[in-house]
């Protein structure tokens, strides 16, 4: 089977990029498959090794020589021409869009081979509306972006794949071509947490979506009862200076530590005893699966979408209403004060994480591709 993944880049450190590489590598190992990753921007080496993958850089470079809206649409036209030419040379069986810049282009391409077109949704459908809008112009722009995406271009795809049943049920009612496939665990760590260290951990980009400001306030409450525990936040991002200032003004230096970027996320998790997530929204919350895979209990905001799918409240962690910082702190304190409960929840999560192994997810994707191609062929032959 000839499979093409189209995405923005595999050089930028992000969840979509890592998941795309991991899935493509796994599919390339299956006999009879040939896999491509087609990117618009490849300014440096891929963030993960590519194993048996054809990497094609279209050289559009959205992130350089960018001159506003006019420049963006000029690059979109260039992207369309190059992508259409390449796909007509490859003649793939399946084309999967995982990025942002190609998502509205693929349904417009003239592809005589009629490949199966799949759009992967790595964010909850209405994620744009979850952002804190700062002006009327931004509100209008986000609304127009959503209308363009969901009322027009997305209908050109054969199938849309979302990450959770929650997203499908809440946001895609009436759509008969929406399917569910979770993300896989993207790394493996043989070392598991003992849940005995006096450390909690959170991982993610330091951006508005992750709401680490809320987590810092929560930890201020936790510290009042448990000053010997500390919180490590691993990641980089545009809000780093603001978060450092918040930590200093809250008197939490040494209690909350911004650790910076690490490529050894699972190893860092295995040295902690709790995983905490305060995101405003997620597409899936892969980091929760990764934390479970090293035996950590979880405390998470019940944001759309993902945490409700991953966490069984009271079994492998706790779910808390978004913004309820008091209850969140109480749940953290409960786990700090009850080591047997921490370990019990950690082991429950470890067992649950096994169903997200990349080998199993890759086989599920292959079966899905086969079924959808057979269905498309049957429809074509019946005309």
Where are these predicted regions, by residue range?
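Short hydrophobic beta-strand element within catalytic cores of glycosyltransferases
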Residues: 297-301
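A conserved mid-protein helix/loop that constitutes part of the nucleotide-sugar donor-binding site
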Residues: 17-22, 198, 205-221, 238-244
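Conserved acidic donor-binding segment of nucleotide-sugar-dependent glycosyltransferases
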Residues: 312-314, 318-325, 333-340, 354
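Membrane-proximal helix-turn-helix segments that form the acceptor-binding/catalytic region
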Residues: 84-85, 139-159, 173
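N-terminal strand-loop element at the rim of the active site
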Residues: 5-13, 26-73
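Carbohydrate-associated surface elements
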Residues: 166, 184
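Short His-centered aromatic/hydrophobic patch
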Residues: 97-103, 121
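Aromatic "clamp/platform" in nucleotide-sugar-dependent glycosyltransferases that forms part
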Residues: 261, 280
